[in-house]
């Protein structure tokens, strides 16, 4: 990893300050650039805040429109709907870096990560997912800041990618617990002889999927082995996660101020909800379970589309139920009036729109990027308040710390959103950037435009996409060819955002100097 001098970083800060109004990532960005601390971690200062507790819940792949507050008329989420009624609702949260691990880096630090530089996919070595790696040496996490302010900090997570060997997302937590078995976690030994998957998919689809993705059967082999093992302990993994969170709350709620950070991988695929939630959305589920949606464009028959959508909705309802168990426990313990509750997600998923499912660098559209952000304050302060305008995940750390009367690290590039809540200031961000790998999307109130931001490293051909959000709010019809002046303007915005962060988003990994 290239090192940058403090003088270089100061120059970068000046350049970034000039671009901040265009990309609008943060009011703190220029100062933050000059505080990029070389190759070492700097301990957060000792601080005294107001000692409010924080319960932060992140559910992976949770679309905003799963909730009534964001327009749901199908998915049943009564517990989160109740939380929304008591919360500040941020209307337009879109991630800066995607998917899973890039977003967790932003959530942990409050710092922008795009453009990305490193490429560690899994524990076996380099992969093809830019930004998918552990925290930098220099990063200062929310948990580290709170520990120095006297907090007890707990991370309870079933997200398998956080648990990979060498990952360090537990930094700053005085307690962490990994719940095993999600997706391709190395949790159960798959059989040497590939099982019969005819109960999962029709034979024609299974053949097409295997031809499109030679590793598909291997994936199914590990997933089904994992599922067989974790079903011994409950109907879903989020059940185990929530039960552990409830246990931790009962044992530690009176230990002083605390941060309880809960990470649920559900409703991330594979989509295999308990039958009692699936039946809410599909009375006749058919002979095939369709647990894993296709990442490629495959010929999914109508019955497969119906089952996949019902599977996803059932997963979301199951997550809601178990989050409800955590929330009701907090209420039982008398925590609702001295605790800040936060619910959000990293990204959403396509459910057959434009013939596509899940997410990818070719589908940075509303269904993937629009996610919920609910913040419930003690005494239901500002309950039901809707905050318009674009916000991003890096705003959460400074916003939370502000409500705790604590100062964020100088490395934070996000913005405290409180003035937008109180009306002291209006949100002036005219656009935000969301990136998936080497592709970035510029979202404005009128348009959503996506294109390759690193043409040197992107492999393959990518045709820029443009969606007219006024005429096409679901972003289904690409109109890039009809609007060259719009694409040119938005491409310039994307280029400025990338150039403004080129040095700010660098860091170092585990360097040892003797």
Predicted feature locations:
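C-terminal, low-complexity/hydrophilic appendages and adjacent surface loops
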Residues: 196-197, 365-367, 434-481, 486, ...
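Active-site-proximal N-terminal segment of extracellular/periplasmic enzymes that hydrolyze or transfer
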Residues: 34-97, 147, 477-485
């Amino acid at each position: 990893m290239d090192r940058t001098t403090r003088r270089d970083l100061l120059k970068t800060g000046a350049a970034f300050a000039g671009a901040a109004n265009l990309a609008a990532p943060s009011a703190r960005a220029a100062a933050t650039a000059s505080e990029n601390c070389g190759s070492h971690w700097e301990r957060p200062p000792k601080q005294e805040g107001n000692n409010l507790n924080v319960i932060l819940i992140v559910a992976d792949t949770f679309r905003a429109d799963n909730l009534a507050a964001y327009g749901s008329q199908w998915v049943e989420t009564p517990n989160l709907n109740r939380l929304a009624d008591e919360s500040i609702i941020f209307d337009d949260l879109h991630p800066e870096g995607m998917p899973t691990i890039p977003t967790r880096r932003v959530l942990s630090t409050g710092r922008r990560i795009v453009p990305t530089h490193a490429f560690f996919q899994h524990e076996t070595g380099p992969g093809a997912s830019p930004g998918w790696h552990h925290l930098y040496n220099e990063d200062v996490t929310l948990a580290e800041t709170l520990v120095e302010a006297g907090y007890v900090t707990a991370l309870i997570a079933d997200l398998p990618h956080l648990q990979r060997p060498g990952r360090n997302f537990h930094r700053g937590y005085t307690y962490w617990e990994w719940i095993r078995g999600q997706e391709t976690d190395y949790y159960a030994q798959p059989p040497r002889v590939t099982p019969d998957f005819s109960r999962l998919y029709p034979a024609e689809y299974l053949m097409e999927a295997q031809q499109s993705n030679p590793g598909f059967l291997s994936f199914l082999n590990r997933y089904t082995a994992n599922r067989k093992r974790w079903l011994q302990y409950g109907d879903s993994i989020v059940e185990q996660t929530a039960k552990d969170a409830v246990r931790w709350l009962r044992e530690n709620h009176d230990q002083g101020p605390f941060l309880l950070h809960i990470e649920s991988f559900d409703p991330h695929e594979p989509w295999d909800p308990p039958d009692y939630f699936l039946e809410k959305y599909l009375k006749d589920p058919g002979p095939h379970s369709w647990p894993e949606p296709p990442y490629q464009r495959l010929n999914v028959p109508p019955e497969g589309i119906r089952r996949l959508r019902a599977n996803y909705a059932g997963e979301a309802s199951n997550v809601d139920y178990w989050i409800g168990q955590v929330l009701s426990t907090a209420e039982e313990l008398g925590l609702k009036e001295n605790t800040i509750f936060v619910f959000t997600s990293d990204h959403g998923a396509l459910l057959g729109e434009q013939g596509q499912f899940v997410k990818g660098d070719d589908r940075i559209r509303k269904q993937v990027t629009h996610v919920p952000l609910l913040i419930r304050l003690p005494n239901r302060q500002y309950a039901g308040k809707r905050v318009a305008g674009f916000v991003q995940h890096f705003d959460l750390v400074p916003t939370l710390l502000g409500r705790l009367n604590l100062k964020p690290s100088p490395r934070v590039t996000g913005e405290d959103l409180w003035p937008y809540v109180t009306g002291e200031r209006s949100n002036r961000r005219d656009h935000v950037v969301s990136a998936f790998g080497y592709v970035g999307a510029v979202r404005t109130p009128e348009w959503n435009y996506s294109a390759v931001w690193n043409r040197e490293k992107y492999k393959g051909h990518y045709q820029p996409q443009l969606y007219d959000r006024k005429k096409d709010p679901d972003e289904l019809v690409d109109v890039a060819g009809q609007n060259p002046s719009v694409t040119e303007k938005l491409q310039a915005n994307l280029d400025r955002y990338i150039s403004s962060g080129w040095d700010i988003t660098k860091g170092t990994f585990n360097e040892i100097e003797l």
